[in-house]
UniProtKB/Swiss-Prot annotation:
Pfam families: PriCT_1. GO terms for molecular function: DNA binding. One of its GO terms (biological process) is DNA replication. InterPro entries: PriCT_1 (IPR014820). The gene is repS. Essential for replication. The keyword DNA-binding applies. Coiled coil: none annotated. This is Protein RepS. The keyword DNA-binding applies. Keywords: DNA replication, DNA-binding, Plasmid. Signal peptide: none annotated.
Length: 496
């Protein structure tokens, strides 16, 4: 893996090519170049948490230290400096010091065996999204996926940092999309510190998968609209019908928590207090009652806010720009500060009667959709990204799943018509069925080496007749997105 090229792809020419002083590769006749931006790098997670790092202003300095750093800031700052005379503690990595946004990144954190995922799971979800990651890095507890922009977004204070606000909304929407099916850390800084690419941690890299900010913006609009957000307010009510938010379990869980600090940052206190205030507002309580209870809550905190900050948060909640606390955001807060094991059932009250299914073994009829789940799981278990299909017989499938013969034939026909699976049947004594899911085929094509891709696609196309299928369409779509010739004036755009 050409790590210097990976680094340069992410940084988008945001740093000088050579060190300003003591360069070992710049020729004598080449001028150092005008000053650009700076990034921060750290040699271990412990150093990163403690703020002990180095300021880097050139690509040469990064390459000199290849594989010695563990973390960095992939988005470029205007300047970087040190907070102490020994030049050990870095200073300057704040949002109002951002120079250019190069990439969005997602942190996939695996805490339990149940949450275990692979890079292939990330790529599979990305296929549904329609935007592929440029880079996937393996970390100690999971993965980080980079979505590098086609051209960087430049940040200006004149626009009141609207580009940062716009990019934050897109970044949050990307995280929430992946968070529906994968263990995503929804609380980490959008443009902060990430894992740095090294020879020992890059799982996937394809520089062709870079998209314009406009494309991300258009997608983000749709995501925001689908959530029911209004453009003027990003927080929307989302309580249980017929139930006051202050009477729901999540409210008491947050109200009686006191330790809102640590690695996640002190911003947790503000977010929690604002959310609790919204719950009081949506439940019909007066602003005076809310203020009194928030003062009581604040006094119990290990690190309380100033009184004027409490009043500001309560008044903001009662400004009528919001109707209630957002259900998704409530879940994020409770998982971050109370317990990561909490589920929706633990947090929200659901009213009404529900008819529960009998166990499948106790039912005479099984829905085709259930057999579909079993078959897709069977295909996934028996194949992998390097051999995305399995060769077997219908008899073996029937015995493995316990599915009737006619049902299997019908299921194969339906799934093939929907292009969810592809198969080829060979008749005769040594015959059988060659079977693959559409996603596993597409994923294997994406991950195969560039020099082998053409012949590999040709072989799969001949085996499974892939011409004029969604696989061919998706590959074209991912590889041939329209390019933008000019830098966007992002600061006049509404990002939804």
């Amino acid at each position: 893996m050409n790590i210097p090229f990976v680094v340069e792809t992410v940084l988008h020419d945001g740093l000088l090519k050579y060190k300003f002083k003591n360069s070992k590769i710049r020729s004598i006749t080449t001028k150092p170049g005008k000053s650009k931006g700076a990034i921060f790098a750290y040699r271990s997670k412990k150093s990163m948490i403690g703020g002990r790092g180095v300021v880097l202003t050139s690509e040469e300095a990064i390459h000199e230290n290849q594989d010695t750093f563990t973390h960095w800031t992939p988005n470029v700052y205007r300047y970087g400096t040190y907070a102490d005379e020994n030049r050990s503690y870095t200073k300057g990595h704040s949002e109002n010091n951002l120079r250019q946004i190069n990439t969005f990144f997602i942190d996939f954190d695996i805490h339990t065996e149940k949450e275990t995922i692979s890079a292939s799971d990330i790529l599979t979800t990305a296929i549904d999204l329609g935007f592929m990651p440029t880079l996937i890095i393996k970390s100690d507890k999971g993965y980080q996926a980079y979505f590098v922009l086609e051209t960087p977004v430049y940040v200006t204070s004149k626009s009141e940092f609207k580009s940062v606000k716009a990019a934050k909304i897109i970044s949050q929407n990307i995280r929430e999309y992946f968070g529906k099916s994968l263990p995503v850390d929804l609380t980490c800084n959008h443009f902060g510190i990430a894992r740095i690419p090294r020879t020992d941690n890059v799982e996937f890299f394809d520089p062709n998968y870079r998209y314009s900010f406009k494309e991300w913006q258009d997608w983000s609009f749709k995501q925001t609209d689908n959530k029911g957000f209004t453009r003027s307010s990003l927080m929307v009510l989302s309580g249980t019908e017929g139930k006051k938010q202050v009477d729901e379990p999540w409210f008491n869980l947050l109200l009686h928590e006191t330790k809102f600090s640590g690695e996640k940052g002190l911003v947790g206190r503000n977010s929690v207090m604002f959310t609790l205030s919204l719950a009081y507002f949506s439940s019909g309580y007066s602003i005076e009652t809310c203020e009194y209870n928030m003062f009581e809550f604040n006094n119990r905190l290990d690190q309380p806010l100033e009184e004027k900050e409490v009043i500001k948060l309560v008044r903001s909640a009662y400004s009528e720009n919001y109707q209630g606390a957002n259900r998704e955001y409530i879940t994020i807060l409770c998982k971050a500060w109370v317990s990561s094991d909490l589920t929706s059932k633990d947090l929200f009250v659901r009213q009404g009667w529900f008819k529960f299914k009998k166990k499948r073994s106790e039912r005479q009829r099984v829905h085709l959709s259930e057999w579909k789940e079993d078959l897709m799981a069977y295909i996934s278990e028996k194949s992998d990204v390097y051999k995305p299909y399995l060769v077997t017989t219908k008899k073996e499938i029937r015995e493995a799943l316990g599915i009737p013969e006619r049902t299997l034939d019908k299921l194969l026909k339906v799934l093939k018509a929907n292009q969810e699976i592809f198969f080829k049947i060979k008749s005769g004594r040594n015959g059988g069925i060659q079977l693959a899911s559409g996603k596993s085929l597409l994923l294997s094509i994406i991950k195969v080496k560039k020099e082998e891709k053409e012949s590999y696609i040709k072989a799969l196309t001949n085996s499974f007749d892939l011409e004029h299928t969604f696989i061919q369409e998706t590959l074209n779509k991912l590889a041939e997105r329209p390019k933008t010739d000019t830098q966007l004036d992002l600061f006049s755009y509404d990002t939804g």
